[in-house]
Amino acid sequence: MMVIVPRIAVVSCFSTTPFIYGIQHEDNLRAGLLLSDPAETIQAFSEHKADIALIPAAAMPSLTDARIVTEYCVGGVPASKEALLASDDALVGAWKPFGKLPCAFAVWAAHADTDPDAVEALQHALTYRLEHGYEAILESAFAADPGRAYAELAHFDYIFDNQKDKALKKFWNSGLKAVPRANPG
């Protein structure tokens, strides 16, 4: 019996450090991890070089066969968005008119034919991330000042809840377009 290892594409940047850590350290998730910039992540997913990907939210409507699959995202809520909205990121800038709404900058998407067991294992890996955020910093490029890095992560809200889902659908329906940067920093 041949085991098919899912391929997971993730943007390699500060805000995804905990997710990457969770994927790398969850014993029940056997997956190939593709680290790249936002445009390459979208391309890998579009070309089926990735089964699951952390996709910039603005790109989701343009992807065929993509569905949001986990309870996690890279997002923010009104109380934490002040720091995020100071960024020069295109999606962050496009979100400014929606300033009172929570936002999801990136969501976990999978193709319709992705093995449900792989999605469940990813969900467990991301939950592991929630429980080991500080350890993720210690093993990252941001370990030089772990206290500051951990405090910076507090600006993000990683739970994809009903409010973010509704806000994201409102954003998509507004017709605003945002092209992800090639290098998120």
Indicate where each model-derived feature is located.
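Domain-level signature for soluble enzymes in the chorismate/prephenate branch of the shikimate pathway
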Residues: 1-185
